[in-house]
């Protein structure tokens, strides 16, 4: 056989990843291009077929259109409706990936300017396997901030090629668009990892520690008597400089710094006296209270009318990112005091891209403006007068995404009854559509001030990567099934009920699952107290272990969750990860019992985060609004072929077991989610003891939330009698006998390697 010729492009990649470094041999896919992992994608999509729910039946992307794609029609360019939906999915994933990659690139450039490119990456004593996503995808072991720049430039390059494919007259097959969406979303996890590692190193965020501080959360955790600075977004470049300026000028105890969305989480990782108002759903409500003297925005998940809303209530506003300029003049070349004077005396709003200057200006404006402003909550009497304007026309209820009884609540408030409105506020996702559409201009969000809970909650500050020592402790129990699974609650706050997340965390932590959280989900998990007045962060230990509840951090910290799954393959199973994506993803799919839950997913970022988990082989449960993403990855249960390779016997085995059953699945109710999540943690590699534990949870949760009886698909997950939980054995055996259940084939080492064309050798899966 002729020796393979290494191309110039391959040589460049080998140079970029320092292929001569001998920490591991370079695997088959260093810095993979769009088609390098296509066969893996197609194998996944063979089992987990895309299921489309078109949000729109038209294509309006080019001047040939509009084109009606219903009833088998094709557009003027030849595209069909499935391919059009897949293209929109790819565009959404690219938006999400670009948001995180842009964040990563920006914060990386800032920190390189501050510390230099040779700043060493050190994630603490207990994290030796840093950057598992970067290592597995690119083949590079990053040692400095400068190395991270190599990685993010690879991500930028791939994004360009992927976006190219969405132009008119390009890709014509829906499965290939799905493969590209999976590729974009894999890159998203790489970009997120770059961002959070850079932040940990550059800002000295917590790492190699589980017991991070408990910080205050809630809209009344912030005092009205002090100057208040509200930071909104995801990029901590400005917020950390606000803290630095306060500390340098001995003002730290004289000014309140609080946040909404992930900048809040990042700021509490930097300073535990900072406070969290809450998730995205609390943004409009809190801005309209007028409590913030200065609002500082950066990027992502910020209301695009925030400058207008700030002006209405007399809050000063500084935009701190080129991603969201709001039409404001950029003043980084001007003196701080000159900017402050115009903001305080003339009410001007500015774009300030110099983070240090923005931090200084924010503090000075807050201290000058606060004494001039009257901050008062709406009284019950005022709320009653406002509510009397409501004529219960029902328009607010029609436009509410969750169909809440807003009009009836207003009628009650007018009579002095606030109970119904309190229920509405607690579930409100903060979109503001009700007030926007009200024909009588009832100030619904102002009225909500009297109904909103005045309680302060506790949130554990984000802790960053899962430690290698923790992986060593839980690797075997997770793979064998005796720890029933890792549940990762992530994503935005577009919930049907905001308390659902806390209920899920409590249910699964109590059952000794490992529960990890990020972003808005991490916040809302702490916004419910039990009978003893404790949140889940006070009730459960912060360890990555059975029964632990772990706040990993912000949106970009999601990379540490996928990273933990990779670490299990490397640290526990000793599989080589360097440029070895397929091998590791195959291991995770077949042997690591993990399930993501994006219960309030709203943004394109949430779409790419979830799809990135899917490519790794981790299923994701989505909330009811997520059907609007247009696409799910569903199996057909018994109808599908569940044949895998037994890596030890080298024989194909029809397992007859749909595990995991789906990769992306929408649940319409919390109750349905409660029984779906444990089922999606079932893996073919489970030992009889592990499977028995998992089925015990599946059955007991079914009885608790679905009205009793046994799950109608239980027989699909019982391989042998030893899998049946002892407590339900008599009931299950009687039912299995009734339906004619038969034992399933034995399997020693499940893998998809060998069932599709791949460069990965079957021997590689044996460890």
Predicted regions and their residues:
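Metallocofactor- and cofactor-centric catalytic cores in central/energy metabolism, strongly enriched
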Residues: 2-440, 444-767
